[in-house]
Amino acid sequence: MEWVTATDGLAFVRVASPSAAEQAWADALAPAINAAIDRYLGSYLGIPSDGEAEIGALALRAFGYGWKYREAPFGEASYVDQAGQSVRLAGDWIVPIKPALNRWRDMGQLLG
């Protein structure tokens, strides 16, 4: 399912006029995030519309993590939050959103 698009992701990270390289990264990143979320959820049949809205918002966050990670492809990516605290980003862009995704995960399918 298309949880996030390159266009929505670029708007989320506040890139109004992306360079060719930025557009190429966004075009690669959005489907990667979508595929990772789909794989993690297993089956999203039966997710209500409010769940789809939440997953869409989480996908934007994952896009933001992936976007920031681009700045340090061979090292640790981090940023400073509004409180001045350093926040380290995981190499797996959906790790920070997995706890919220668990609400919508088809556990029966995963257990067999």
Show where each model-derived region lies.
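Divalent metal-cofactor coordination and adjacent catalytic microenvironments
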Residues: 1-112
